[in-house]
Amino acid sequence: MPNEIFTINLNAQAIIPEAFILLGIVGTLLVDLAGEKTASRWAPVICYISLGSSLVSLAFQWSNPVNNAFLGSFNSDNLAIAFRSIIALSTLISLLISWRYTEQSGSPIGEFAAIVLSATLGAMLLCGSTDLVSVFISLETLSVASYLLSGYLKRDPRSSEAALKYLLVGSAAAAIYLYGSSFLYGLSGSTNLSTIGVEIINKPSFITSLSLVFVLSTVAFKIAAVPFHQWTPDVYEGSPTPVVAFLSVGSKTAGFAFAIRILTTSFSSFDEQWKLLFTILAILSMALGNIVALAQTSMKRMLAYSSIGQAGFVMIGIVSGTQDGLSAAVLYLAAYLFMNLGAFSCVILFSLRTGSDRISDYSGLYQKDPLITLGLSLCLLSLGGLPPMLGFFGKIYLFFAGWANHQYLLVVVGLVTSVISIYYYISVIKMMVVKEPQEASEIVKSYPEIKWNIIGLPPLRIALYTCIAVTALGGILSNPLFKLANSAVSETPFLQDILAVTNNML
């Protein structure tokens, strides 16, 4: 009988998608041992098979989720499936745009792919972790791999500096999480997130509030929310651009998945407190992220501050605490995947051809490279929330959900900062399109001939076309996509009780 109970509670099929990622890690490391030529040929194929199999298995799990696996330490519910799918897809696109960059930098491709897949594994496990211990293991798997990726260009001092800064701040965030977790365990006698929520209902104290602040600090670090954002611009500027592309979507998505799960389960009785703190973080992130982005001269730093502001928009949906709000947050993260990675695809392509990251060097680019100009323009307009782009509908759903939940201040700040973001996005577009031939930058004047048959460029082209198409045409499918996100929220058991209480309060 005990063996039967153990078998039932284990439910190992819940992590089949992660198992495919693990096999991909092993495969890429093995081909890396066979030599650089073998790795260059087979590492991408292994990654595609691994991530494709993971996405297919997630699709099969959608209709048959596993809500209690590994003795209650992992849930493969619909919300976790949605977030894990976003992360796996972001990794696939990030790898497509990274092969040429990695090849040109002279870095081992197999090793790079293995570390990216390791970060993906940690991020996906974090989305479904329901135990303080499994959360920490997943968090550290993601973090350590991210540190390695940030410093992957060993010969570039900026990359090493970025990795060191990321390591120091990330280690502090991990220590803060452990300290907060120790308080939660001491108060509840359990490491299970749901059990903690039940045990601390009648134990409001300074220690409980302190644990909330510590855990929320870790969440804010992962999603790069103000004032825990200081690492973001420096790490984004110094790290390899494909790594930045992955971190801006994959790591942020995992952070939001973790935030929703721990705040709505362990701190469900502190609903007002964490929503107040999240509101402050959202306002600061939207305001500072978009205002400081105005003054940036580096494209990567501008996108770094932009990502801080985008995190603030997603937080509007989480603070609303309603089914529509959480659904809008999921939808916007899915839209952000294509908008942001599309923009980074253009930045990578431009840097491969020119070696420059300065915004001023994009001046007059339309005359030499219409594809990058069109792609970057569409993605930036979508990030700004202009119709009929996918980003516009994502923001509309977030603002409507916030307004319906009486989050008027958040919505007003969101609207104002969206207008500010449109200004600096359009400034870049204007620089690329409007300039006369004689006003083009020196780099654009000597722009090299475009050759798409070079190793690594065809996958980048596929990723760029995909992101442009989804960003530009995704608005047409915004309603079906929102319904899909809505079903992910409504069919997740741990959210049903929370949503019922919220609906009764409205």
From Swiss-Prot:
It is a multi-pass membrane protein. GO terms for molecular function: NADH dehydrogenase (ubiquinone) activity; quinone binding. Belongs to the complex I subunit 2 family. HAMAP family: NDH1_NuoN_1. Its EC number is 7.1.1.-. The gene is ndhB. It is found in: Cellular thylakoid membrane. It is an enzyme of class 7 (translocase). NDH-1 can be composed of about 15 different subunits; different subcomplexes with different compositions have been identified which probably have different functions. It comes from Prochlorococcus marinus (strain MIT 9515). It comes from the Bacteria. The chain crosses the membrane at residues 14-34, 42-62, 79-99, 108-128, 132-152, 167-187, 206-226, 240-260, 276-296, 302-322, 330-350, 374-394, 409-429, 462-482. Keywords: Membrane, NAD, NADP, Plastoquinone, Quinone, Thylakoid, Translocase, Transmembrane, Transmembrane helix, Transport. GO terms for biological process: ATP synthesis coupled electron transport; photosynthesis, light reaction. NDH-1 shuttles electrons from an unknown electron donor, via FMN and iron-sulfur (Fe-S) centers, to quinones in the respiratory and/or the photosynthetic chain. The immediate electron acceptor for the enzyme in this species is believed to be plastoquinone. Couples the redox reaction to proton translocation, and thus conserves the redox energy in a proton gradient. Cyanobacterial NDH-1 also plays a role in inorganic carbon-concentration. This is NAD(P)H-quinone oxidoreductase subunit 2. InterPro entries: NADH-Q_OxRdtase_suN/2, ND/Mrp_TM, Ndh2_N. It catalyses: a plastoquinone + NADH + (n+1) H(+)(in) = a plastoquinol + NAD(+) + n H(+)(out); a plastoquinone + NADPH + (n+1) H(+)(in) = a plastoquinol + NADP(+) + n H(+)(out). One of its GO terms (cellular component) is plasma membrane-derived thylakoid membrane. The keyword Transmembrane applies.
